[in-house]
Structures are given as structure tokens and as C-alpha cells.
């Protein structure tokens, strides 16, 4: 009798995706982040569902409903902090996952890469809308400033902002629609993640060497399922450490103050995972220019397949490219740090230099270095 996992129409799909999937034998721990992102998404959907049972999206009660969750709901404080810090873990895994793709040349799998960039945009939109919901002081002003950026769009900008707000400021209508979108989008993300996997399994996984690995593949289960489980346990350990010991480490203290439209915080900033893009936005004195630079700082990922000039797939055997890749990583850390600093000298100048360096490395230096490496290898 043939095994049910190979014949049943539904179980067969799971079998081809997670059990009998031919996987390159040499993929490292950097390939764990895909499954960790799935794990993070499940945590966010489950905790978010329980939070939605108690949250009210009304300007008068939003802040108190979050307080009520933390004080009166059984383990409400745990659910709330798991959800808030789960977003941070999600973005840490996302940045590492994208970084792995850039380092090992995974962007040459065009469909998978482009769906991945769309996923990144969807996760960023979801996280932003979720940040607005507790209606703390920084939530409110962050929402006001970021949505107001759309007013930089010529001709329709102001109308567009008022349409998104549902009025003349971030109010009840804004909160209600953001809550609706914040609830729905994670399920859209889950669907996109399945499409991402579907495209990945059309070509098979990349591997650290960047070489074709058809002759050296092993089944996903038990080898990589155990490896992914270990990764999930390590992530869970780090995550629960953060949630139970320092739950407010990555948050903003201003969010413990209810939103006050009459009192602007001295320094408005988004969550830490948006700071690099926020710095790029602030570095350009022109509003429309800043918004375009902000969007392009993420959209630039779509250009990597076009900018790939090397005859080699991966950076594993390209020390010059590696050097500039790590300079780019250091630059992103610098941008993140500057985003959290006040808008004054020397932070403005450092931010502008780091922003120029970010685009220069990606658009000019990395392709040029790749061509130089080809020449040095006489390719």
C-alpha cells in the first residue's frame, strides 16, 4: 500500500513542501530564518487574535482598553508584550533573511525575490498600523507625521491624507480603519508567504556556495526539520527572555502617556525597525524628495537582480564584495542609530553621509566591485 502522504491530495502538498522536499545538503543556519519568520507570523496572529477580543478602536477607550488587557485580563500583560516584542523579533528575522539573500545572491530567483519584497512592504504597513492602535503619545504623533508624508504627493496629496484619516486629523475613523487593516493584513501576509514558498520550490533552494546543487540533495525531513526546530527553540528562548525580563526595552516610554493632540513630543520617532528609513527621509530637506528616498530605500531591493554584475552567484568567494557588503550593514546600523537621535548637529550631517553611502554602495560600488572581480579572475 502506498503511503498516504504521497497519495492524499492535501497531504501530498505538505509532503512535497516540508517532508520529501529535495534540499541542498550544505545550507547553513542562515537558511533557518524562513521557518523562523513563519513561526513569528503564527505567534503574531495568535496573540493578535486574543488582543482583538479585548481591544476597542475608539479614541476615548483605545488607551484604557490596552491598560485593561494588561491589568484585568488573565495573562493579558503576557499576550500584549508577546505581540509588541513579537514584531521586533519578526523584523530582526526579516532583516537577517533579506541580508542572507543579498549575501548569497538569492535575488537571482526573480519571482521568489519580488514576492519577498512585496511581503516586506506588507509587514512594514501592518506593523505601522499596529503601532498606531494603543493611542499612546508617540503612537498618535508617529501616525500623524508618517501619514502626513502623503501630502507631499503633488495635486492630490492633501485630499489623500484627509481620505486616509477619515477627517482632518488622526481620529476615531483612522483608528477604526487601521484596526480593520491591521487585523486582515497578517492573513494576506500568510497567503503571500505561501506564494513565496511556491515560487521557491519551483527552482529549489539556493546554497552558500552559489553552485548548482542538483547532484547533492537530501530530504528536508528529518535533517532540516530538526535544524529548524532548534532554530525555533533558540528564537523562543531569546524572545521570552525579552518579553519576561525587559518587555519595554524596544518600546517608547511616551506610549505610556495617553495621546494628546495639543502636546507634541520633543522628538517624534517611529519604532526601531523603521529608523533606518526614517533617517533617509529626514536627510533630505525637501518633503517630496524625502518621501521618494524613503520609498526607494526599500524598493531598491527590487533592483538587485539587475545590478548583479558578477559571474559568481554568491559572495562566498568574493572578498572585495564581502568587504563592501559589511560596510553596508554597518551603514544600516548607523542609519538606525541616527534615526533615534534629535534633529541637530552633528546627527543631521552623519545621517546625510550615511544615506548617500547607502545608495552609493548599492547602486555604484557593489556592481563596480563585481566587474573588477570578474576582471581579476579573467572571466
UniProtKB/Swiss-Prot annotation:
Keyword DNA-binding set for record = no
Q: Which residues bind heme b b566?
A: 97, 196
Q: Where are the transmembrane segments?
A: 33-53, 77-98, 113-133, 178-198, 226-246, 288-308, 320-340, 347-367
| Gene3D superfamilies given in the database record | Cytochrome Bc1 Complex, Chain C (1.20.810.10)
Kindly list the positions annotated as binding heme b b562: 83, 182
Task: Specify where it is mainly localized.
Answer: mitochondrion
A Pfam family annotated for this chain is: Cytochrom_B_C
Is Membrane set as a keyword in this record? yes
Please provide, in alphabetical order, the Gene Ontology terms of the cellular component aspect for this entry.
mitochondrial inner membrane; respiratory chain complex III
GO biological process, alphabetically ordered: mitochondrial electron transport, ubiquinol to cytochrome c
Question: Where is the protein situated, by its record's location annotation?
Answer: Mitochondrion inner membrane
Protein's name according to its UniProt entry: Cytochrome b
Gene name for this UniProt entry: MT-CYB
